[in-house]
């Protein structure tokens, strides 16, 4: 059986990247929450 996680940096950045987050209201709220929480990284690094 094929595993579900097949890593790809392109897919990773397109779905979870900073610009992807900024594109929608929900994504901006995610960043806002992470800033409020004091996260060192707001989005996963590629």
Swiss-Prot record:
Database matches in Gene3D superfamilies: 1.10.287.3980
Signal peptide range in chain numbering: none
InterPro entries, per the entry: Ribosomal_bL34, Ribosomal_bL34_CS
Annotated Gene Ontology cellular component terms: ribonucleoprotein complex; ribosome
GO terms classed as biological process: translation
Keywords from the UniProt entry: Ribonucleoprotein, Ribosomal protein
Entry superkingdom: Bacteria
GO MF, one example: structural constituent of ribosome
Family annotation (PANTHER family): LARGE RIBOSOMAL SUBUNIT PROTEIN BL34M, MITOCHONDRIAL RIBOSOMAL PROTEIN 34 FAMILY MEMBER
UniProt family annotation: Belongs to the bacterial ribosomal protein bL34 family.
HAMAP family: Ribosomal_bL34
Protein name, as recorded: Large ribosomal subunit protein bL34
